[in-house]
């Protein structure tokens, strides 16, 4: 049976499989070092929509459609969607997945939403509550700036060192059906606040929590990082 492991982890007796995945991103992301690994690059940041929020919804639906296409699955075969975004009331997710008519668990974890959706989706499949589940997340530079910092129309100047929110979406299909990769366990992180107040340095805000979770994962599963 599934078991609690260490202080913050779970080990799956029946690990769920990563059956398919897909990624969609904007032009800037496509020009970066990971560009060739992205499935679909959208040159138009608006994706043909009238506002940033609708553009982010379009990112989600495109990523989901690609993942389903890779898996050879139809929306009717998916039991649940675990999905989230960076916006209030998860509006990008709500409007993005509406047409699929799949039961939705809306999740908000900011930059940890991807890990959060995968964790809960994996628990659901491993426990036998579903056989096919989607885990989805998205963000958009324009919509995030509008909600959290300065709307692009304001014309605020950013330092060259400023962190940029990704314009993109990722979708994962977890399944009880065997595939090339599986999730053997999860470690859930805690809120760790070192008092960083610079909204243009998101990495510094998140790094302490990330480091704490990685360290706890290694201890809970009795693993050690690879040496030089």
Where are these regions (language model features)?
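A glycine- and small-aliphatic-rich helix-loop capping segment at beta-alpha/alpha-beta transitions
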Residues: 34-37, 93-103, 125-127, 148-157, ...
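Short, well-ordered, mixed-charge alpha-helical segments that flank or form enzyme active sites
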Residues: 90-91, 141-146, 191-195
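Condensing-enzyme catalytic core mediating Claisen C-C bond formation in acyl metabolism
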Residues: 1-53, 151-216, 220-224
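Short beta-strand segments
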Residues: 19, 83-84, 133-139
């Amino acid at each position: 049976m599934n078991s609690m492991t260490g202080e913050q982890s779970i080990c799956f007796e029946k690990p769920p499989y990563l059956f398919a995945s897909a990624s969609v991103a904007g032009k800037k992301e496509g020009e970066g070092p990971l560009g060739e690994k992205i499935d679909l690059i959208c040159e138009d940041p608006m994706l043909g929509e009238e506002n940033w929020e609708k553009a982010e919804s379009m990112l989600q639906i495109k990523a989901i459609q690609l993942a389903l296409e890779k898996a050879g699955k139809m929306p009717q075969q998916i039991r649940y969607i675990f999905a989230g975004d960076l916006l209030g009331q998860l509006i990008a997710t709500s409007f993005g997945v509406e047409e699929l008519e799949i039961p939705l668990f809306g999740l908000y974890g900011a930059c940890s939403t991807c890990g959060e959706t995968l964790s809960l989706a994996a628990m659901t499949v491993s426990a036998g509550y579903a056989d096919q589940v989607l885990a989805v997340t998205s963000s958009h530079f324009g919509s995030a700036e509008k909600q959290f910092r300065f709307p692009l129309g304001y014309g605020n100047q950013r330092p060259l060192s400023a962190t940029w929110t990704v314009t993109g979406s990722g979708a994962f299909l977890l399944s009880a059906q065997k595939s090339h990769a599986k999730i053997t366990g999860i470690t859930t992180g805690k809120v760790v606040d070192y008092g960083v107040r610079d909204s243009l340095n998101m990495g510094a805000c998140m790094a302490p929590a990330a480091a704490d979770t990685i360290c706890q994962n290694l201890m809970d599963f009795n693993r050690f990082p690879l040496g030089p």
